[in-house]
Amino acid sequence: MSTDRTQHEFRRRQIESGEARCAIFRRTYDAPMEDVWDACTNPVRLSRWYAPVAGDLREGGTITQGDFGSGTIRRCAAPHLLTVALGGDPALDEIELRLQPGPDGTTVLEFEHATTLDSHEIGGQIFDAVYCMGGGYGPRLVTLGLHLRGELPADLDPTTLHLLPEFAPAITASMRALDELVQTDKAGAAPCA
């Protein structure tokens, strides 16, 4: 688990509530696209590697993501695209899952989180909102791979990944990559992954 094969990208784009800063996580899985789609949209499977998810998992439906808030499914085009608006009306954040076939039966997953928020408070400290995404999504993309390979421990609670030492390398790598991209953006240079 110490090797992080996740690629990171940063960009800006418009969402419902204004200009958003976007963190993009790209990873290739050795699994068919339909299996990756099911793992990312089936509430039973999501609860194993991501978080408990409940609600109406159709376009226009409302979902809850455990302690991660609730949202509305804006677009759903199985097995390629899922867009969820989060944080009110208009949405302050948007997450988008994009899948495409990769070489030799693999699947390329792109997970994008767009936010109009500048910061998040964690443990009484203020952090850049994009920087914080690395700590959450980095280890979850690792656990998705373990889940797809049938190697995820049965007693793993995905809501506590940040507390488990075996996921520290994925958290650190993701947060470091996103911090570099955010700093590049603040300096006015064109960011690259």
What residues fall within each predicted segment?
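Hydrophobic pocket/interface hotspot
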Residues: 36, 46, 73, 82-84, ...
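Aromatic-glycine hotspot motif
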Residues: 1-29, 107-110
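Short beta-edge strand/loop motif at the mouth of beta-sheet-based domains
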Residues: 17-18, 24-25, 31, 35, ...
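Intrinsically disordered, low-complexity boundary segments flanking structured domains
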Residues: 9-14, 50-52, 97-98
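Terminal "cap-and-tail" regions of soluble proteins that handle hydrophobic small molecules
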Residues: 1-15, 114-193
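Hydrophobic-ligand binding "helix-grip"
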Residues: 54-55, 62-126
